[in-house]
Regions:
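Short recognition patches in nucleic-acid-associated and regulatory proteins
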Residues: 153-185
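Sensor-1/coupling segment of RecA-like P-loop NTPase cores
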Residues: 114-137
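Residue-level preference for the first positions of well-ordered beta-strands
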Residues: 19-21, 47-49, 92-95, 120-122
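A short acidic, amphipathic alpha-helical/loop segment
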Residues: 37, 105-113, 137
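Conserved P-loop
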Residues: 2-85, 129-140, 153, 177-209
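Catalytic P-loop NTPase motifs of RecA-like helicase/translocase cores
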Residues: 101-103, 130
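Short basic (Lys/Arg) and small-residue
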Residues: 145
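Walker B catalytic acidic pair
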Residues: 97-99, 125-126
């Protein structure tokens, strides 16, 4: 086979995909934007998948704090995202909510979907955990994404300064040790999360006095 015929036999791609990462603290509208983006793409006749992991609803759904929601595929650690997409006849884009909780291998798979299959991938998530340390998946997204956007919806600390860090609160006190991923803010759960400015995150002040 000549070089020219080999190129002719290669699968044609009409366009390149893009991998975008949208990040910000809690309450900045990440899930709301993910749902809006899915709605906009579907209106244009595009076919997509919506993925999530550890959504506050406890089920395979993307839900926002303002009451919006959509069914989604629940991402578990051993789910191969390339294999998932290839099971479908047509996928133009993938919405990945709570992408900070994915495995690093799954972030690599998202890049594969973009580079090898021309699929647009839109990932949404936190950058850092309750210890103010970056999630491994978020770090890999910062390294691989074509475009990175910090969401501009203003989230405030109790003092009025911009909220930047996600504090874990147990029994009314800020904690800095424990498992990286613990779901809170659900019903009467003893664990909740609060967005703080850097000053009050470091001092541990929750503004309750």
């Amino acid at each position: 086979m000549t070089e020219l015929s080999a190129l002719s036999a290669a699968p044609a791609r009409t366009r390149d995909g893009v991998l975008r990462f949208y990040f910000g603290p809690m309450d900045c509208g990440k899930s709301t934007l993910a749902l809006q983006m899915n709605y906009n793409h579907r209106r244009q006749g595009r076919h997509g998948l919506v993925l999530t992991k550890h959504d506050r609803s406890g089920g395979p759904r993307v839900t926002s704090r303002i009451g919006l929601g959509s069914d989604a595929v629940e991402v578990v650690d051993d789910l191969d995202l390339v294999a998932l997409v290839r099971k479908h006849e047509r996928v133009d884009y993938v919405i990945c909510d709570e992408a900070c909780f994915y495995t690093v291998a799954q972030i690599e798979q998202l890049a594969d979907l973009t580079d090898d299959f021309g699929i647009d991938v839109y990932a949404f998530g936190l950058a850092s955990d309750f210890r103010s340390q970056m999630f491994p998946a978020a770090q890999r997204l910062f390294e691989l994404a074509d475009e990175i956007s910090r969401l501009q919806v203003e989230v405030l600390c109790w003092c009025g300064r911009p909220g930047r860090l996600n504090a874990r609160v147990v029994g009314g006190a800020l904690v800095r040790t424990g498992e990286q991923v613990v779901i809170g803010d659900i019903g009467d759960a003893p664990i909740r999360y609060q967005v703080l400015c850097r000053r009050h995150y470091r001092s541990g002040s929750l503004g309750q006095d």
